[in-house]
């Protein structure tokens, strides 16, 4: 049972930058758009694709335990842009939206049900504001949002944002966003936008690795 984690944020909020503290051989990066990273590092395990089947195969095949899909929202956008012209109108459009929602839903379900428990898959997505003013992951509109509540498939949703010129992760909802995490997984409501720290906290919480303080106490 793999763990899917959603990271949302505006462009420039620091989502991709949060990967910076992973070692070059520590992370498997799936680039949906193929854009360069915003820091001087190249991850040895990098794959560029926007094909759902290719993504699923890559998730299964890689021995890496930390995996990032950046930007996962463009799996949705690219599918729509590549197929909407041929969908026509009426039922064709609804069929396309059903297919788009189904494919993303199946990918998250695949992570949960088919990957080993030590694999954590981070879905990086842009954020959007709905008509009620709530901050949520950006999709392609109401037709898709009515079919599947993306954030509802994730136990952990962190929001990347800027606070006084500092890039941070929000770990607890403000009441106007979909940020959430299990009780006591993170010590603070805000933390540095360091996905390596997040990854460590998740693994400690679920007992995949020992807490650093326990290891330190054991050595003394």
Which ranges hold each PLM region?
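Conserved P-loop
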Residues: 1-69, 73-78
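Conserved GTP-binding G-domain of TRAFAC-class P-loop NTPases and closely related GTPase folds
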Residues: 130-220
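A general structural signal for short secondary-structure junctions and capping/turn motifs
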Residues: 18-20, 58, 113-115, 147-151, ...
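Short, well-ordered beta-strand core segments
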Residues: 27-29, 121, 157-159
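A short helix-to-beta-strand connector/capping loop
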Residues: 42-46, 117, 153-154
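Conserved nucleotide-binding/hydrolysis micro-motifs of P-loop NTPases
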Residues: 24, 33-37, 73-74, 127-131, ...
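Conserved acidic residues
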Residues: 65, 119-120, 151, 155
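P-loop NTPase motor core
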Residues: 71-149
């Amino acid at each position: 049972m793999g763990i899917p984690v959603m990271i949302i944020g505006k462009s420039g909020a620091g989502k991709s930058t949060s990967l910076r503290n992973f070692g070059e051989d520590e992370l498997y990066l799936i680039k949906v758009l193929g854009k360069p990273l915003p820091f001087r590092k190249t991850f040895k395990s990098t794959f560029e694709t926007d094909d759902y089947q290719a993504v699923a195969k890559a998730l299964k095949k890689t021995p890496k335990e930390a995996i990032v899909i950046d930007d996962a929202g463009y799996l949705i956008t690219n599918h729509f842009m590549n197929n909407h012209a041929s969908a026509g109108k009426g039922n064709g459009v609804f069929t396309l939206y059903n297919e788009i929602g189904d494919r993303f839903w199946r990918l998250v379900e695949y992570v949960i049900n088919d990957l080993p428990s030590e694999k954590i898959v981070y879905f990086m997505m842009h954020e959007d504001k709905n008509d009620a003013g709530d901050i949520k992951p950006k999709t392609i509109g109401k037709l898709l949002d009515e079919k599947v509540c993306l954030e509802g498939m994730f136990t952990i949703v962190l929001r990347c944002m800027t606070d006084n010129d500092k890039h941070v992760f929000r770990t607890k909802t403000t009441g106007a966003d979909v940020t959430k995490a299990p009780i006591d997984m993170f010590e603070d409501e805000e933390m540095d936008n360091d996905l390596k720290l997040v990854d460590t906290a998740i693994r400690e919480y679920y007992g995949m690795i020992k807490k650093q303080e326990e290891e330190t106490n054991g050595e003394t």
